[in-house]
Amino acid sequence: MTDHRVEFVDVASMAQWIQRDGVGNIIAGMVNFLEEDFKKWQSFDKIPRVASHTPFGVIELMPTSDNITYSFKYVNGHPSNPARGYQTVTAFGLLTDVDNGYPVFLAEMTLLTALRTAAVSAMVAKHLARKDSRKMAMIGTGSQSEFQALGMRAVLGIEDLAVYDVDPAAIEKFRRNLEPLGFRIHAASSVDEAVADADIITTCTADKQQAKVLLNSQVKPGVHLNAIGGDCPGKTELESEI
């Protein structure tokens, strides 16, 4: 019987890669790969994510194949986890050989999920936002918001941010982490204030209880909307009129 080895990338290895190459550089590189994948979208064998919803959160499986390899990602989303000392999101992924069904690659994907989410946002903004976009409003300043900011700067050159969160401590953490990297950050006291001069509005929230983060009246013509928190029932973020 043929010997078989499954390659494995753990949390430490993923962190070393990010530290070596930098979040912005990684996201910019991901955008190139994602653009090629979206061009081949119709050729992938795929189904919508399989989700299990509970009062605590959601656990999802995301399978796809190109008939050469098959892969899936496991990811959860539990908004109340930080209060209990856990991460909101954890993830891992498996790649297999379609020819023999053997797994060939297993990877920790919690950090990779954060990078990929930001890369998709940056890729879409690259093609749909106005080319002269220079200011972004960020509604919700949890951990993903920092990846969003770094990705938008790497791909679009945006460094002026107006941010709002219902938790002042989250805003302060965002500023503490990103201002030393050269971002110009205005801590707004309301959503209205944050979006007033925005070319791009990113909503980046996790709590199902806040179903309407952004109202139609707050969106000016020509603004690009990047709503990434509305990923399951009850998390719409945008008013229906939008």
Label every model-predicted segment:
Residues 128-135, 157, 220-221:
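Short helix-loop-beta connector
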